[in-house]
A protein has these predicted regions:
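Conserved donor-binding/catalytic core segment of Leloir-type glycosyltransferases
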Residues: 174-193, 199-203
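Short hydrophobic beta-strand element within catalytic cores of glycosyltransferases
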Residues: 276-280
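Short alpha-helical donor nucleotide-sugar binding micro-motif in glycosyltransferases
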Residues: 238-239, 246-251
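Nucleotide-activated donor-binding/catalytic signature segment of Leloir-type glycosyltransferases, i.e.
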Residues: 225-242
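Donor nucleotide-sugar binding/catalytic pocket of nucleotide-sugar-dependent glycosyltransferases
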Residues: 128-178
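Aromatic "clamp/platform" in nucleotide-sugar-dependent glycosyltransferases that forms part
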Residues: 259
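A short, histidine- and acid-enriched strand-loop-helix "catalytic/donor-clamping" loop
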Residues: 99-116, 128-131
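Conserved acidic donor-binding segment of nucleotide-sugar-dependent glycosyltransferases
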Residues: 237-238, 292-293, 297-304, 312-319
């Protein structure tokens, strides 16, 4: 089976999923993707195993993809959204020739732009794809509004490198399963990630407790100066995927105060590593991976005092209660895995082919 994956920027977690897919019997991959951005400078060496690959920087450098796809002749064409013209053209070109799957992580927010997309859906983007692959239920709501029937909606678009983070958790358990007294933030240091709220909440939290935990901040971006130099905050810069499991295992809680976050794979990474999670109500993956009082807590994205209070509660939590939350996160993490990611795509294709045969 020949599968073409047309993505935006590759990441460590997608790399793990692609390796799982490529390892399945009879699967041959072609991957088209945009070069990495400065805010997420993933080492290109980790993707060198992909033999059939096309990297592009802009629409001009994407022109060669039509020829490459024609030569590859995919049975399955997975493409990222409808915003890349070259991918839209490819989807149209392979109508009736390949099973076309559009990926989507946009939550339904009811914005004017989304409402216009719903009105236009029968003409665009619905005809571009035979199925849509969404990250979760908030995205499935949008997909249904775009005229995708439930039978052609695939879930579980994203998974972290689940085995690597599970292994980090096991290492911590082998060392006594004690929590490292640190908060952890992982993400781009950008306005939509709630960086200012994070800085203010952490400062308020430090004023409330006698022995505050440090806050480890991993990432780069335009708002680095908001955090850098603040008491108790340690800046690491961008962390490569191979280093992140170890970092997760050396913290006690993930904090994610995003103001705009369609999904956030880092929540799955934290859950796999057995970390409780404090996430804003704008984090798309939280609806599936954070159960308030069970493995973490939710807060309004602009509620600085609310976040400070939750950080205080986490600091004052007993070790046995922290372990319960840690175990709960691990249990919730099993909703997604690299194995399941590959299964979803291959099972979806099999069902689509069976339905097509039955209709003839």
């Amino acid at each position: 089976m020949r599968i073409a994956i047309l993505w935006t920027e590759l990441s460590g977690y997608l790399n793990a999923c692609l390796k799982e897919l490529a390892g399945r019997p009879g699967v041959e991959l072609f991957v088209g993707h945009q070069v990495s951005s400065q805010d997420a400078p993933f080492a290109l060496s980790q993707f060198e195993w992909i033999e059939n690959r096309l990297m592009w920087r802009d629409q001009r450098s994407l022109r060669g993809i039509a020829t490459r796809l024609k030569e590859f002749n995919p049975d399955v064409l997975v493409f990222s959204g409808w915003h890349v013209r070259g991918y839209r053209d490819a989807a149209r070109a392979f109508k009736g020739k390949a099973w076309r799957v559009m990926t989507m992580d946009n939550c339904w927010l009811g914005t004017l732009k989304q409402m216009l997309a719903v009105i236009a859906a029968p003409a665009f983007p619905r005809p571009l794809a035979d199925a849509v692959w969404v990250s979760g239920e908030r995205q499935a709501v949008f997909a249904r509004k775009l005229r995708f029937e439930q039978r052609v909606i695939l879930n579980g678009l994203y998974s972290c490198d689940s085995s690597a983070f599970h292994a980090a958790r096991l290492e911590r358990i082998a060392d006594g399963n004690t929590r490292e007294l640190k908060f952890l933030f992982v993400g781009r240091l950008a306005r939509e990630k709630g960086i200012r709220v994070l800085a203010q909440a952490y400062s308020a939290y430090r004023a409330r407790v006698s022995a505050p935990w440090p806050l480890i901040c991993c990432g780069t971006g335009s708002m680095e100066t908001v955090l850098d130099g603040q008491p108790g905050i340690e800046m690491t810069g961008f962390i490569q995927p191979s280093e992140l499991p170890r970092l997760m295992s050396s913290a006690a809680c993930l904090v994610l105060p995003s103001d705009f976050e369609p999904w956030a794979v880092v929540v799955h990474e934290a859950a796999c590593a057995g970390l409780p999670v404090l996430a804003s109500n704008r984090v798309g993956s939280a609806i599936h991976l954070v159960q308030p009082g069970y493995n973490g807590y939710l807060f309004d994205s602009q509620d600085t005092e609310g976040l400070a209070g939750l950080m205080q509660a986490m600091t004052e939590m007993s070790e046995p209660n922290w372990r319960k939350m840690s175990d709960a996160s691990f249990q919730l993490s099993h909703q997604y895995s690299t194995e399941r990611w590959a299964d979803i795509l291959l099972e979806g294709y099999s069902m689509a082919m069976s339905a097509d045969s039955s209709s003839r």
